[in-house]
Amino acid sequence: MTAPLFESTITSLPLINKGKVRDIYAVDADKLLIVTTDRLSAFDVILPDPIPRKGEVLQAVANFWFDKLGHIVPNQLTGIDPETVVAENEREQVRGRAVVVKRLKPLPIEAVVRGYVIGSGWKDYQETGAICGIALPAGLKMAAKLPSPIFTPATKAAVGDHDENVSFATAQANCAADLAEALAGTGKNGAGLADEARIAAIRLYEEASAYARGRGIIIADTKFEFGIDAAGTLHLIDEALTPDSSRFWPADHYQEGSNPPSYDKQYVRDYLETLDWGKVAPGPKLPADVIARTSAKYIEAYEKLTGKTL
């Protein structure tokens, strides 16, 4: 097994951005190299310890969904082998954890779809009887399945900041303002693309949820990101239905009224909640057993979803 990768050092390509988990490099004017590291963030803080094989799992899960759901909306994939765009001595850094993608203009929103009342949605529902302003039936319990999935967009926060839930009208306005220049001459507008993203996100969630349920996994909620090409065509970008962007529950542990265990970083979040820590950088170091348990959770999620071994 290769050593965990906390940070990539690809010097043969220009570095464009380092996110919470992904390092992005320019391949050329039309393509990017995205390297999924083993970094883990919790409460919007990057923790100092990498989680072994986490990056491999995230990329493998995303690739699985991109392939499975490609008929719903185009995606960012180019089909180019990442090892062919870096220097020979850098191939180990991209093997199994990187992807070459189209350069696309991102929509300025996180496309969140919720199928169950949990997390911040549960808190919101308890206080208001709604989630992000969307009224729901009275009397729902924690982890209850919603009558139908709901779309609750959020702003995209910079590294270290928190995403903020916004109304769909605000999401449309943000897209209209941010995409106006990119859409000039295409006959499309940002508000319309926000609606396209909403429809696509719900379809993606519904189809993925049905598949995962057959594999013994409940997808409680998830977050998508979308971008557009020069013609204004919507594409699914970033990651898709991974343990980082979604809440996966084992179906055999699901019980309405309680918070099920998750195949994701919730184990780390639960540990961090036991600490006297202000949830600001720098994050605390993780014990070896928490790191090992979290790595195993990620690998288990991939294998249970796909029926394959990593």
UniProtKB/Swiss-Prot annotation:
UniProt KW ATP-binding keyword: yes
Keywords: ATP-binding, Ligase, Nucleotide-binding, Purine biosynthesis
Superkingdom in the source lineage: Bacteria
Lineage: Bacteria, Pseudomonadati, Pseudomonadota, Betaproteobacteria, Rhodocyclales
Single GO biological process annotation from the record: 'de novo' IMP biosynthetic process
Family annotation (Pfam families): SAICAR_synt
Pathway it works in: Purine metabolism; IMP biosynthesis via de novo pathway; 5-amino-1-(5-phospho-D-ribosyl)imidazole-4-carboxamide from 5-amino-1-(5-phospho-D-ribosyl)imidazole-4-carboxylate: step 1/2
Name recorded for this polypeptide: Phosphoribosylaminoimidazole-succinocarboxamide synthase
Catalytic activity: 5-amino-1-(5-phospho-D-ribosyl)imidazole-4-carboxylate + L-aspartate + ATP = (2S)-2-[5-amino-1-(5-phospho-beta-D-ribosyl)imidazole-4-carboxamido]succinate + ADP + phosphate + 2 H(+)
Sequence similarity: Belongs to the SAICAR synthetase family.
GO cellular component: cytoplasm
GO terms assigned for molecular function: ATP binding; phosphoribosylaminoimidazolesuccinocarboxamide synthase activity
Species in which this protein is naturally found: Dechloromonas aromatica (strain RCB)
